[in-house]
Amino acid sequence: MRLKVLWVGKTQEEWVRRGIDEYAGRIGRYMSIDLAEARDEKGAAVEAMREREGERLLKLLPKNARLVLLDERGEQMSSPELARFLATNRDGGTQELVFVIGGAYGFSDSLRAKAFKTISLSRMTFTHQMVRIFLLEQLYRGFTIINGEPYHH
């Protein structure tokens, strides 16, 4: 299985980039990971921005990808539950598992329609920049749980 994480907009802060690089490198010890960003849309009506960003994200999706959206209204999982989800997909023959962090106004209906699952990291609201690090850390934590390593206690 290949892992891909997509998001909308450039990573603005250097310290966020360092965090992304750190956790992507750690994940790479367990599985191939690809990170990609779609250009964010500015200056249009909210629905138009969602649609344009959705189109850009759809173009970045590999064929046969199993799509997981991150949304505050999604299903909340514990770290062990996320680990089981990762293991089930890996062992069940999923070729590409793609996690997507949307833009400031969320996801287009066309992207939501393609989603296999929608999850939430928390009921709290975080910046889209911070969510990148939080998601990657949780994916790394999931792989350490799968492998019985002491990172998660």
Curated annotation (Swiss-Prot):
Classification via InterPro entries: Alpha/beta_knot_MTases (IPR029028), RlmH-like (IPR003742), tRNA_m1G_MTases_N (IPR029026)
Record carries keyword Ribonucleoprotein: no
Coiled coil, from the record: none
GO cellular component term, pick one: cytoplasm
Superkingdom classification of source: Bacteria
Enzyme Commission identifier(s): 2.1.1.177
Protein location: Cytoplasm
Catalytic activity: pseudouridine(1915) in 23S rRNA + S-adenosyl-L-methionine = N(3)-methylpseudouridine(1915) in 23S rRNA + S-adenosyl-L-homocysteine + H(+)
SUPFAM superfamilies in UniProt: alpha/beta knot
GO molecular function, one term: rRNA (pseudouridine-N3-)-methyltransferase activity
Binding locations of S-adenosyl-L-methionine: L70, G102, L121, S122, R123, M124, T125, F126
Pfam families: SPOUT_MTase
CDD domains hit by this protein: RlmH-like
UniProt keyword list: Cytoplasm, Methyltransferase, rRNA processing, S-adenosyl-L-methionine, Transferase
Predominant subcellular localization, coarse grouping: cytoplasm
Family, as annotated: Belongs to the RNA methyltransferase RlmH family.
PANTHER family: METHYLTRANSFERASE, RIBOSOMAL RNA LARGE SUBUNIT METHYLTRANSFERASE H
Subunit structure: Homodimer.
Role noted for this protein: Specifically methylates the pseudouridine at position 1915 (m3Psi1915) in 23S rRNA.
The protein, known as: Ribosomal RNA large subunit methyltransferase H
